[in-house]
Amino acid sequence: MGKRSNFERVEKDYYPTPLEAVHPLIPHILGYVKTFAEPCAGDGSLIRHIEYLTNNLFDIDYIRCNYACDIEPKDDGIHEKNIFNLLPKDIETSDVIITNPPWSRDILHRLIYHCTSIKPTWLLFDADWMHTKQSTHYRDMLKKIVSVGRVEWIKG
């Protein structure tokens, strides 16, 4: 799906995370993250990719997800919970939040405030958002932007 395309959106912005989108993130979290929470887990793709990449490609103790939830879980082990009901106690043993959030800006912007108030947060979404007026209110919360390049999010 392109940003300027007219494809019909998938309900609840459910687009599983492709491996290609996760690989560039790994060097930035190695040595800093041992556990993470995934509050928009969907089918668990992002979790599997992070655990696979850190367990198989790097000679380290792999990074593991110790809490996963979604408004509509699509895999076992993912709790049913709306991200906006996520509490600090739910993820107190997680080092960070890492998620591929919904594309809808009204949800994304609320999610940025909510997640960053709980834990350091890594979000996978379009990098050019940083250069829009709507990002102005959120820029002070950002520490780093990692570009993942062009990625095919919808197979076919």
Predicted regions and their residues:
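Class I S-adenosyl-L-methionine-dependent methyltransferase catalytic core
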Residues: M1-G156
